Amino acid sequence: MSKLTKNQKLALGKIEAGKAYTLKEASALVKEITTTKFDASVDVDVRLGVDPRKANQMVRGVVSLPHGTGKQVRVLALCTPDKEAEATAAGADYVGLDEYINKIKGGWTDIDVIITMPSIMGKIGALGRVLGPRGLMPNPKSGTVTNEIGNAVKEVKQGKIDFKVDKSGIVHTSVGKVSFTPEQIRDNAKEFISTLIKLKPTAAKGAYIKSIYLSSTMSAGIKIDPKSVEEN
């Protein structure tokens, strides 16, 4: 394990051991403890009281972050020719069909999100081996299989993200950048956590939100008091 730098030690010292911070406090503190020279991502990790191996306890959904993610999201719109102008106008980085299907078959995955139409899913099913492991397979539940191509592209570009619980019962997502104001970080994190709470499966027993941590790339995690999420 590499030694901590002087700045990292100072940053770590700002987190009080064992303390659960309010979301408001944590959103300001995460900026103070970040020592990277680049604009680091701000991440939220929520441990849920669910058993993801059971279909009736799977948690997945979408959320539109009020201040976006701060990331440049590369969008591929796989659509019929009559929808190409709509997708391009909405801001899709790549627009087409057979040309891009062939590129993906050849291993090309230099994109973050694929948006497509129900009528085309038959062609895209064959790409599952390439897209599935990378989390790129379009899904009606996340709004990436739709006839409203333009709207879907705009939403993704503006900060709509999809998430799902992993096999350990944790949901992890990025809610912005360190360059965001504490208020923007808090608003985004609050929207994400509130959405998670609404998605609680009826089959889940006991405490649903077990823990919440806020961190930035390479920073320590800041424990958050779940009760503080809805506070103003």
UniProtKB/Swiss-Prot annotation:
rRNA-binding listed as a keyword: yes
Q: Which CDD domains match?
A: Ribosomal_L1 (cd00403)
Output one GO BP term: regulation of translation
The source's superkingdom equals Bacteria
Alphabetically sorted, this entry's keywords are:
Repressor, Ribonucleoprotein, Ribosomal protein, RNA-binding, rRNA-binding, Translation regulation, tRNA-binding
A Pfam family found in this protein is Ribosomal_L1
Q: Name one GO cellular component term.
A: large ribosomal subunit
Which molecular function GO terms apply here? Answer: rRNA binding; structural constituent of ribosome; tRNA binding
Q: Which Gene3D superfamilies match?
A: 3.30.190.20, 3.40.50.790
Q: Which InterPro entries does the UniProt record give? A: Ribosom_uL1_bac-type (IPR005878), Ribosomal_uL1 (IPR002143), Ribosomal_uL1-like (IPR023674), Ribosomal_uL1/biogenesis (IPR028364), Ribosomal_uL1_3-a/b-sand (IPR016095), Ribosomal_uL1_CS (IPR023673)
The answer to keyword Ribonucleoprotein applying to this record is yes
Q: How does it assemble?
A: Part of the 50S ribosomal subunit.
NCBIfam families in UniProt: rplA_bact
| Role | Binds directly to 23S rRNA. The L1 stalk is quite mobile in the ribosome, and is involved in E site tRNA release.
Instruction: Give the similarity note.
Output: Belongs to the universal ribosomal protein uL1 family.
HAMAP family tied to this protein: Ribosomal_uL1_B (MF_01318_B)
Q: What is this protein called?
A: Large ribosomal subunit protein uL1
Q: Which organism was this protein described from? A: Parabacteroides distasonis (strain ATCC 8503 / DSM 20701 / CIP 104284 / JCM 5825 / NCTC 11152)
Name the gene for this chain: rplA
